[in-house]
């Protein structure tokens, strides 16, 4: 092992696989400024974009293929991409000799976890969702430790000896949201604020919903659309392709209602803010992870759940207006989603990683 303190993170595909890792790195920097950080991901990807916006995290790309549960001719070509990804990861890790490899999810993480296993480097895989994805299921076969965001996820890893319920880290900006930001975004409106958030990649179904309901003059709408729509401001509506972390923290905390997908990272941020939330989980083309996340909250009366197929029939504007008038319902939803809060997750994980580094270097 190197005399330096080095941790490699790997993961990507969506913000939900990247922001938690960034949060952990931010906390580690506060506790130990001698640690060097690297992130292995896919070239020209969302992880490359987000990591290169950070200070003191070096990004390295590897070839990677998508892991599929179904038959596709791409499985053959992607198989070789995975192999090349393992080989490149092997030589990268051999060169830098990190003490820990930390996988945050997504198929890009699997080659690096396998390579770190071959090199006997301590490796951790973190499942952010309730239901583990295929990448995490594979990673868990090679990992020394599995971190889970939901206690209920333990049942999926019955044969693994080292499972730790750490929660899912949230971005530091969400711990101290600034109320002035949402006032600036909404031009100091006195109207109730409803925010429609499509996530880091946007969401066509939510974009279409926003375009249908934004004309209601009684509500101020904030809309994160992703790159498929241009930025726009109207009398009671603001649309941005992306909001930065400080803006998003203010939006989540001070909106009257949030309409969102049901990624685990977003749910944890809503829980931290005690947000009244309408969840419309991604359904088409997904493995069902968001549906399980949302249904878990629904069973705890912690959100309003709407099936993606029912968006057009659900009369969401009516649901919004009825909810805004029902203070008791709002208070119940806020109190119940708060139970999923784990704002100390970054600190817990950072302390565990520092302990692992010390144990590794003492050998």
Swiss-Prot record:
Gene Ontology molecular function: any one: undecaprenyldiphospho-muramoylpentapeptide beta-N-acetylglucosaminyltransferase activity
EC primary class: transferase
GO cellular component terms, semicolon-separated: plasma membrane
This protein's pathway: Cell wall biogenesis; peptidoglycan biosynthesis
GO biological process: carbohydrate metabolic process; cell division; cell wall organization; lipid glycosylation; peptidoglycan biosynthetic process; regulation of cell shape
Membrane topology type: Peripheral membrane protein
Top-rank lineage group of the source organism: Bacteria
Pfam families reported for this sequence: Glyco_tran_28_C (PF04101), Glyco_transf_28 (PF03033)
InterPro entries documented for this protein: GlcNAc_MurG, Glyco_trans_28_C, GlycoTrans_28_N
Compartments reported by the entry: Cell inner membrane
Annotated binding of UDP-N-acetyl-alpha-D-glucosamine, by residue: 14-16, 171, 200, 290
Alphabetically ordered keywords of this record: Cell cycle, Cell division, Cell inner membrane, Cell membrane, Cell shape, Cell wall biogenesis/degradation, Glycosyltransferase, Membrane, Peptidoglycan synthesis, Transferase
Catalytic activity line of the entry: di-trans,octa-cis-undecaprenyl diphospho-N-acetyl-alpha-D-muramoyl-L-alanyl-D-glutamyl-meso-2,6-diaminopimeloyl-D-alanyl-D-alanine + UDP-N-acetyl-alpha-D-glucosamine = di-trans,octa-cis-undecaprenyl diphospho-[N-acetyl-alpha-D-glucosaminyl-(1->4)]-N-acetyl-alpha-D-muramoyl-L-alanyl-D-glutamyl-meso-2,6-diaminopimeloyl-D-alanyl-D-alanine + UDP + H(+)
UniProt-listed Enzyme Commission number(s): 2.4.1.227
CDD domains found in the cross-reference section: GT28_MurG
Family note: Belongs to the glycosyltransferase 28 family. MurG subfamily.
Role of this protein: Cell wall formation. Catalyzes the transfer of a GlcNAc subunit on undecaprenyl-pyrophosphoryl-MurNAc-pentapeptide (lipid intermediate I) to form undecaprenyl-pyrophosphoryl-MurNAc-(pentapeptide)GlcNAc (lipid intermediate II).
NCBIfam families recorded: murG
HAMAP family with a match to the protein in the record: MurG
Protein name as it appears in the record: UDP-N-acetylglucosamine--N-acetylmuramyl-(pentapeptide) pyrophosphoryl-undecaprenol N-acetylglucosamine transferase
Gene coding for it: murG
């Amino acid at each position: 092992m190197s005399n330096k303190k080095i941790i490699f993170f790997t993961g990507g595909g969506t913000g939900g696989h990247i922001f938690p890792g960034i949060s952990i790195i931010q906390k580690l920097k506060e506790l130990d400024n001698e640690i060097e950080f690297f992130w292995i991901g896919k070239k020209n990807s969302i992880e490359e974009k987000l990591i290169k916006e950070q200070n003191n995290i070096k990004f390295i790309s590897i070839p990677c293929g998508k892991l599929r549960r179904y038959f596709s001719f791409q499985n053959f070509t992607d198989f070789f991409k995975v192999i090349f990804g393992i080989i490149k990861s092997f030589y990268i890790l051999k060169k830098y000799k990190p003490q820990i490899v930390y996988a945050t999810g997504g198929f890009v993480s699997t080659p690096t976890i396998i390579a770190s296993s071959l090199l006997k480097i301590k490796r951790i895989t973190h499942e952010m969702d309730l239901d583990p994805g295929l990448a995490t299921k594979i990673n868990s076969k090679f990992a020394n430790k599995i971190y889970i965001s939901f206690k209920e996820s333990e049942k999926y890893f019955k044969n693994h000896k080292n499972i730790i319920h750490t929660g899912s880290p949230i971005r530091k900006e969400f711990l101290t949201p600034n109320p002035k930001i949402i006032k600036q975004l909404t031009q100091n409106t006195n109207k109730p604020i409803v925010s429609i958030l499509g996530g880091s990649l946007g969401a066509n179904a939510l974009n279409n919903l926003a375009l249908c309901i934004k004309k209601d003059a009684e509500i101020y709408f904030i809309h994160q659309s992703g790159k498929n729509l241009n930025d726009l401001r109207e009398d009671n509506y603001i649309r941005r392709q992306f909001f930065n972390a400080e803006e998003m923290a203010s939006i989540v905390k001070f909106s009257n209602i949030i309409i969102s997908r049901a990624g685990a990272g977003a749910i944890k941020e809503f829980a931290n803010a005690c947000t009244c939330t309408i969840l419309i989980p991604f359904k088409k083309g997904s493995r069902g992870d968001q549906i399980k996340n949302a249904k878990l909250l629904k069973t705890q009366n912690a959100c309003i759940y709407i099936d993606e197929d029912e968006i057009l029939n659900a009369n969401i504007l009516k649901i919004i207006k009825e909810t805004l008038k029902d203070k008791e319902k709002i208070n119940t939803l806020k109190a119940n989603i708060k139970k999923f809060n784990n704002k100390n997750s970054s600190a817990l994980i950072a302390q565990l990683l520092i302990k692992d580094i010390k144990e590794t270097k003492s050998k």
